[in-house]
UniProtKB/Swiss-Prot annotation:
Species lineage: Eukaryota, Metazoa, Chordata, Craniata, Vertebrata
Organism per entry: Mus musculus
Reported function: Seems to bind zinc and copper. Could play a special role in regulating zinc metabolism during the differentiation of stratified epithelia.
Protein name per its UniProtKB record: Metallothionein-4
Family: Belongs to the metallothionein superfamily. Type 1 family.
Record-listed a divalent metal cation 2 binding positions: 8, 14, 16, 27
Length: 62
C-alpha cells in the first residue's frame, strides 16, 4: 500500500501503522504518525499539525 494513502477514513483501528503519512486519515492509531515531530506523550496532537523549529516542535503541543 502507498504510505500516502489510507484505507481507514472512519476512525478506529488502522493498518497504516507507523508509516501513515496521510493527512485525511481518521484512524486513532495513525494520529501521532501523521505528525512526526509531536512528542510521544502529547495527547493534543492532531492530524495535519505543523512542525516548526526544525521539525522538533509540534504546533499542537507545548
Amino acid at each position: 500500500m502507498d504510505p500516502g494513502e489510507c484505507t481507514c477514513m472512519s476512525g478506529g483501528i488502522c493498518i497504516c501503522g507507523d508509516n501513515c503519512k496521510c493527512t485525511t486519515c481518521s484512524c486513532k492509531t495513525c494520529r501521532k504518525s501523521c505528525c512526526p515531530c509531536c512528542p510521544p506523550g502529547c495527547a493534543k496532537c492532531a492530524r495535519g499539525c505543523i512542525c516548526k523549529g526544525g521539525s522538533d516542535k509540534c504546533s499542537c503541543c507545548p
